[in-house]
């Protein structure tokens, strides 16, 4: 996390001195070993799901979209959401992994091309109560445009692009939170 190994030496050290605000408390329900197994991808997925819940997204509100669903963060997000009772729509560029995503708990699998349909439109039909975006760019924009009134989108990736080109309509007209 933060800039360990990039701008702060010691990323591979057994011990390192860091500012206290960089430290994250170990969850009470996990052992040290379990918390390390989860790793960065699991931690990021957990924070993304927590973000949806903190914005009032609940299983009864509708489907949750997860982009980049076969990746590390995406696959853990699919599993966490399904375990929490959400109906998950997994978006992937690897349609051959549909059975893997269904095993994790996805109720539906869509392709990237399906998600990008009508991308020129400023808003799309309300399809999702929320989304976990691990890809960024036009995929994040489409997730925002397809989120229903009062929904939320969490974003944590930028493999497609770091920029976001979307109108303010979903935020103003639907109260979507990002």
Task: Mark where each language-model region is.
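Glycine-rich phosphate/adenylate-binding loop and adjacent beta-alpha elements
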Residues: 1-25
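Glycine-rich phosphate-binding loop and adjacent beta-alpha segment
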Residues: 3, 7, 138-178
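Short, glycine/polar-rich helix-capping loops at beta-to-alpha or helix-loop-helix junctions
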Residues: 11-12, 93-100, 162-168
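Local beta-strand N-terminus motif with an aromatic residue
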Residues: 13, 106, 127-129, 171
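C-terminal boundary of histidine-terminating zinc-finger modules
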Residues: 33
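Mid-domain Rossmann-like dinucleotide-binding core that forms the NAD(H)/NADP(H) cofactor-binding site
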Residues: 36-112
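Short amphipathic alpha-helix with an adjacent loop that forms part of the alpha/beta core around
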Residues: 115-126
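N-terminal Rossmann-like NAD(P) cofactor-binding module of classical short-chain dehydrogenase/reductase
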Residues: 129-132, 154
